[in-house]
């Protein structure tokens, strides 16, 4: 019984910590242009998600990506990323 209580308390503490960390993140718009079409690696949003991960870092955590086709086999990716702390 003690083990179950400790597990529940641990889960509650973890959920409070993760909720507080998520509130501290600030999201900034990011616009980048890449070669290729919007569907090079799947859906347009997934293609841009992978592009941003490759050009920035995983800590940028891109989300809500939109892809806009451009002339000359290029694409513009508009995503929200975690703002730099600088």
UniProtKB/Swiss-Prot annotation:
Signal peptide: 1-22
Family recorded in the similarity comment: Belongs to the DEFL family.
Species whose genome carries this gene: Arabidopsis thaliana (Mouse-ear cress)
PANTHER family per UniProt: DEFENSIN-LIKE PROTEIN 242-RELATED, DEFENSIN-LIKE PROTEIN 245-RELATED
Keywords from the UniProt entry: Antimicrobial, Disulfide bond, Fungicide, Plant defense, Secreted, Signal
Cysteine pairs bridged by disulfides in the record: 28-83, 38-67, 48-77, 65-79
Originating gene: SCRL11
Example GO biological process: signal transduction
Disulfide bond recorded as keyword: yes
Main location: secreted
GO CC aspect terms: extracellular region
Protein's name according to its UniProt entry: Putative defensin-like protein 244
Keyword Aminoacyl-tRNA synthetase: no
Alphabetical list of Pfam families matching this protein: SCRL
Location in or out of the cell: Secreted
UniProt-listed InterPro entries: SCRL (IPR010682)
